[in-house]
Regions:
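Short coil-to-beta-strand transition motifs
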Residues: 103, 182-188, 233-240
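Positively charged n-region of N-terminal signal peptides that target proteins for export
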Residues: 1-4, 19
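Sec-dependent N-terminal signal peptides
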Residues: 4-13
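Ser/Thr/Gly-rich low-complexity blocks that favor extended beta-strand/coil architectures
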Residues: 212-242
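N-terminal segment of the mature soluble domain
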Residues: 25-32, 40-108, 143-147, 216-220, ...
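C-terminal segment of classical bacterial N-terminal signal peptides
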Residues: 13-19
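Amphipathic beta-strand/beta-sheet edge segments enriched in Tyr/Trp
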Residues: 103-155, 248
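C-terminal/domain-edge helix-coil "capping" segments
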Residues: 20-25, 139-214, 218, 247-286
Length: 286
């Protein structure tokens, strides 16, 4: 009876909830509570989760919804903690799907430590070390879309006077790492609509049909592909790379061509469709 009432409440809430994709084409993604060992406090676990939420939100790529903001999901989470309901993930998946979630982000925290060190003068301090894994799941069928493990320690571990301070400072790296996480798992696709400037038959800058509505920001990187028909099947061939130079409007951005200017120019003259797909930043990337 409780389960029937819960699902009925969720159905009512869904009338006012989010669709799987909003009018700007952004996918609705719920972020669940994170699992953790008993040795890790809830305060530190929530601090990590909040930093991850901040990092994803700043990318503005998806409509991110915290399950903690939805009373039906909070109630369902409490229900799962009852002995009779432990391990029942079906109802939770049903809840997510009914509420319009395209994907669900789940987190599992492996460790959060402040490792004691001593400086050259013999003074003790602590170095943060945080490890966790994020999974992206399609709640409609349980399919795993992607998974990524993170470890912030060493050069990405911060220093503190206490273990807790070192851990909390290290969490800033978790926020920063969400840029690549979003670019890797929530790719965005568009097209080159016009070549803006050229030099010696090479495209130098181009306009693309993506802007603020899809969360595009200055510095975003794209891979450029030519759309080809091979024996009746559409295929993509990589021909270049772009960097967003300026976001002009909701649906337009100016990009500099960092690779493949000649191929892009040739394809434009031949009126071939040039598809762009977002990519994550790398240390040596153009």
């Amino acid at each position: 009876m409780k389960k029937i009432l819960l699902l009925f409440s969720i159905c009512l809430i869904s009338m006012l909830g989010y669709a799987q994709t909003n009018e700007d084409g952004k996918e609705s993604v719920y972020i669940d509570y994170f699992s953790r060992p008993g040795s890790i406090s809830n305060i530190l676990a929530e601090a990590l989760r909040n930093k991850i939420i901040e990092g994803i939100q700043e990318m503005n790529r998806v409509v991110l919804i915290d399950v903690d903001s939805n009373e039906a999901l909070k109630a369902e989470a409490r229900r799962r903690q009852e002995t009779s309901a432990m391990g029942d993930v079906v109802a939770r998946s049903e809840a997510m799907t009914t509420l319009g979630a395209k994907y669900l982000i789940q987190g599992n925290i492996t460790s959060m430590q402040g490792i004691k060190k001593t400086d050259s003068k013999g003074k003790p301090y602590y170095k943060g070390s945080v490890s966790y894994t994020l999974k992206i799941v399609d709640p409609s069928n349980g399919t795993l879309k992607g998974t990524q493990a993170f470890s912030h320690e060493g050069l990405t571990g911060s220093i503190g006077d206490t273990p807790e301070e070192a851990i909390l400072k290290t969490l800033d790296y978790a926020k920063i790492s969400m840029d690549d996480f979003v670019n890797e798992n929530f790719k965005i696709q568009g097209t080159i609509v016009q070549v803006e400037s050229t030099k010696k038959d090479k495209a130098q800058t181009v306009y693309v049909d993506l802007g603020t509505k899809r969360g595009i920001q200055k510095g975003q990187k794209f891979t450029v592909y030519i759309e080809m028909d091979i024996a009746g099947e559409l295929s993509l061939k990589e021909v270049g790379r772009l960097n967003v130079k300026e976001v002009l409007s909701g649906a337009r951005s100016l990009c500099s061509v960092s690779k493949g200017g000649e191929e892009i120019m040739r394809a434009t003259k031949e009126e071939k469709k040039l598809v762009i797909i977002s990519r994550k930043d790398t240390f040596l990337s153009l």
